């Protein structure tokens, strides 16, 4: 995969993370996909299980926005350096992280592992959930 191909894929795929449409997002993944992120470090296997996770995750974060900073080609895919703007209560948490994206022969994601420091995000979620005193 070239840098241009990685960028083109990210321009189609990353917007599907916004707007709480888990079926649209899951359609980018193969039937036997593997996905993990800091919230599920052991990951999920298979599109059906991933869809269940996405239904919960996207419902909690319908307005977050993910954009690519850089795509670095690797075997069968790319390393995606990304930026996320995540609304939490009245604050916007900004995160930079990486994930690797490996595609199958049909151009669907067969492996997606997401890594970032979620310290600030967890702190803001905890503050937003505390009842006002």
Residue ranges and their predicted role:
Residues 59-60, 85-94:
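Short, cysteine-centered beta-strand-loop-beta hairpins and adjacent loop/turn segments enriched
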Residues 96, 100-125:
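Short beta-strand edge/turn micro-motifs at domain boundaries
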Residues 31, 88, 105:
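Short, ordered coil/turn segments that flank beta-strands lining enzyme active or ligand-binding pockets
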Residues 34, 91, 107-108:
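Residue-level signal for well-ordered, solvent-exposed loop/turn and beta-edge residues enriched
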Residues 54, 66-72, 83-84, 96-102:
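Hydrophobic/aromatic beta-strand elements that line small-molecule binding cavities or substrate pockets
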Residues 3-4, 15, 22-75:
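A solvent-exposed, acidic/Ser-Thr-rich amphipathic alpha-helical stretch
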Residues 1-4, 127-133:
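Basic/polar N-terminal segments that are highly enriched at the extreme N-terminus
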